[in-house]
Amino acid sequence: MPKRRDILAIVLIVLPWTLLITVWHQSTLAPLLAVHKDEGSDPRRETPPGADPREYCTSDRDIVEVVRTEYVYTRPPPWSDTLPTIHVVTPTYSRPVQKAELTRMANTLLHVPNLHWLVVEDAPRRTPLTARLLRDTGLNYTHLHVETPRNYKLRGDARDPRIPRGTMQRNLALRWLRETFPRNSSQPGVVYFADDDNTYSLELFEEMRSTRRVSVWPVAFVGGLRYEAPRVNGAGKVVGWKTVFDPHRPFAIDMAGFAVNLRLILQRSQAYFKLRGVKGGYQESSLLRELVTLNDLEPKAANCTKILVWHTRTEKPVLVNEGKKGFTDPSVEI
């Protein structure tokens, strides 16, 4: 049997700890209980005698709406007279994930100052879905459309590398820029071809804003590699390409890996992407060789060592149950 003094020693050790834990629980829970009590009957929200309670509900809703407007929807940033405008050219086409991808992209572009979004649909007319989405973003945008001929469209799920994607849409955007701005325009700007299935760092847009002729940087998840990049020497000049697929292309670079000064686009009016007679992977070269030489390229992103754009692509949804047992509602826009 334990001795009496052993029991006393245990009590003297346990009792102080019990008291400490009890006090701590009371100090922690008391404010929470007070908060819940206040939520149940907040004296500050009691309707004064003779007042209409509906007026107070409306006032609360107005306050919430003001907060939402001021802190959530105050985008894009105010326009600056000193920053060059970034003209982002995005070809797009109708598919289940189109709205999701354009929404994700818009949420990025809303944080970029002095940005103009040129969205070009591969369609015979501008679709209501894209028109509503662009209008609701609050971005400075232009909505165009041109349909790719049937013989240049993909058939089924197979990807034919000989068939260029988005070429006519990008070319229409180039034509729009040349028709909108005079050839000798002093308007400072940069043109960037940004597909809607990529992920973009905000830092990328500030990197490209200072483009004098053509700036370049790495792109992740392309060419079967973690990333492809321009090869830059110790003097900071582009001397080649870090890629496996046809590294001897004139410009072995992804569409998301370069930006062009607007004045260069306006001055070289013959420069377009080639639709015919161009092998897969040569679309970028077909435009850039009309604008610059390798020696003219300006490496960005810490001499092409930082990844600021990823060719992520949205997973194609598996809609095998769509239309079964009355679950389909075509009126719901996705």
Curated annotation (Swiss-Prot):
Pfam families hit by this protein: Glyco_transf_43
CDD domains: GlcAT-I (cd00218)
Catalytic activity: 3-O-(beta-D-galactosyl-(1->3)-beta-D-galactosyl-(1->4)-beta-D-xylosyl)-L-seryl-[protein] + UDP-alpha-D-glucuronate = 3-O-(beta-D-GlcA-(1->3)-beta-D-Gal-(1->3)-beta-D-Gal-(1->4)-beta-D-Xyl)-L-seryl-[protein] + UDP + H(+)
Subunit structure: Homodimer. Interacts with SAR1A.
One BP term from GO: carbohydrate metabolic process
Organism: Homo sapiens (Human)
A Gene Ontology molecular function term of the record: metal ion binding
Active-site residues, Swiss-Prot/TrEMBL: E284 (proton donor/acceptor)
Pathway(s) of this molecule: Protein modification; protein glycosylation
The enzyme's E.C. designation: 2.4.1.135
Function, as annotated: Involved in the biosynthesis of L2/HNK-1 carbohydrate epitope on glycoproteins. Can also play a role in glycosaminoglycan biosynthesis. Substrates include asialo-orosomucoid (ASOR), asialo-fetuin, and asialo-neural cell adhesion molecule. Requires sphingomyelin for activity: stearoyl-sphingomyelin was the most effective, followed by palmitoyl-sphingomyelin and lignoceroyl-sphingomyelin. Activity was demonstrated only for sphingomyelin with a saturated fatty acid and not for that with an unsaturated fatty acid, regardless of the length of the acyl group.
Residues binding UDP-alpha-D-glucuronate: P91, T92, Y93, D122, R165, R170, D195, D196, D197, H311, T312, R313
Family note: Belongs to the glycosyltransferase 43 family.
Protein name: Galactosylgalactosylxylosylprotein 3-beta-glucuronosyltransferase 1
Gene: B3GAT1
Keyword field: Endoplasmic reticulum, Glycoprotein, Golgi apparatus, Manganese, Membrane, Metal-binding, Phosphoprotein, Secreted, Signal-anchor, Transferase, Transmembrane, Transmembrane helix
GO CC terms, sorted: endoplasmic reticulum membrane; extracellular region; Golgi membrane; intracellular membrane-bounded organelle; membrane
Site (Interaction with galactose moiety of substrate glycoprotein): E228, N321
Region (Essential for transport from endoplasmic reticulum to Golgi apparatus and interaction with SAR1A): 3-5
